[in-house]
Amino acid sequence: MADVLDQLNEREEALLQNILAPHLDTELSDDEVDAIAEAGRQCSECGLPIPTTRLRANPFAHRCVSCQQDWEEGR
């Protein structure tokens, strides 16, 4: 079952990248980045809040650093 879930997560990631790609070339203003960071977001893997510093560095992040590292390493 985990393999199916991994495949679904990878497909979701690819779809999100395709959807977001046209917008990634657009620079966000500092105010927009601040608004995203202050609004907060939950990690799509563990459900914990994504730290403000991560959202400031990557406003489009949908995983916390730890879960992103695990995902990239295939855990």
Curated annotation (Swiss-Prot):
GO molecular function: zinc ion binding
InterPro entries: Znf_C4-type_bac, Znf_C4_TraR, Znf_DskA_TraR, Znf_DskA_TraR_CS
Keywords for the protein's UniProt record, in alphabetical order: Metal-binding, Zinc, Zinc-finger
Gene3D superfamilies assigned: DksA, coiled-coil domain
Zinc finger (dksA C4-type): 43-67
GO BP terms in the entry: positive regulation of secondary metabolite biosynthetic process
NCBIfam families the record matches: C4_traR_proteo
Entry protein name: Uncharacterized protein HI_1497
Organism: Haemophilus influenzae (strain ATCC 51907 / DSM 11121 / KW20 / Rd)
